[in-house]
Amino acid sequence: MDAGHIPVLLHECIDNLNIRPDGIYVDGTLGMGGHSEQIAGRLTTGTLIGIDRDETAIARAGARLAPFGERVQLVHGNFRDTAAILDRLGIDAVDGMLFDLGVSSPQLDETQRGFSYMHDAPLDMRMDESAALTAREVVNTYSYEELRRILFEYGEERYAPAIAKRICQHREQKPIETTLELADIIRSAMPASALREKQHPAKRSFQAIRIAVNDELGELPPMLDAAEKNLKPGGRLAVITFHSLEDRIVKKKLQELAQGCICPPEFPVCVCGRKPKVKLITRKPIVPGEAELTENPRARSAKLRVAEKC
């Protein structure tokens, strides 16, 4: 396994996917291929479909997964299009799907990608480098109201109005070009009490802008719809989230799919005919243990939810 990349909740994911040697599995967030490597290693006649919007990730994971030969098929694409990708590959149903959401460690560590507030780089933040929208465009062209909404809704940043105002003031003088420039502007808009907090003052704002650039929350409903449509009965969905916004959407959708009869309790028999579409394997999310957190502190906010198609 790549020493520089530690897959989050690896054993918990693999155990909960109930991998069959002849099954078909989707890793919708291929990344460095850590989860995929463990899935492919458990297949004999089965197939793994690895999807990633980041072409750099496809190339790196491709080299890592090359020993598995035709058991692995890699696709440059967005996991929101999972259903269409499977249709294009002529695959109607699969035995399991895994989605590890959010920005990957390599993307954070590659300074030039512009995801990190710790190193100076052009404002980019695109997971798919062929996409048009960049963080620079968001920061320099979105209105005050749009910026305030993004910072508040996607970053849950309580100082969103002040930060959005300061961004607009600075860009009137000259465009905001780099990550450290933006981080300094954010810091300058926050009160002294906020700067004394353990968390970096730019963390929430950078998360919010990244989510906006990549439409990370908008991708979740079609991803979950694909799981409902394309999983075989007994097939499992595993989703790792890293912040409350993602987890809330995933939790709500899975609870809706798991709900059966919605008739009023006074009805003697069911007349709605509604049946559960999935069974929740994890009523509460699985979180990393202390051993994993010691090895990989970035896993601290990870939550794994698992459901099985009925």
What are these regions (language model features)?
Residues 1-310:
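S-adenosyl-L-methionine-dependent methyltransferase catalytic core, i.e., the SAM/SAH-binding region
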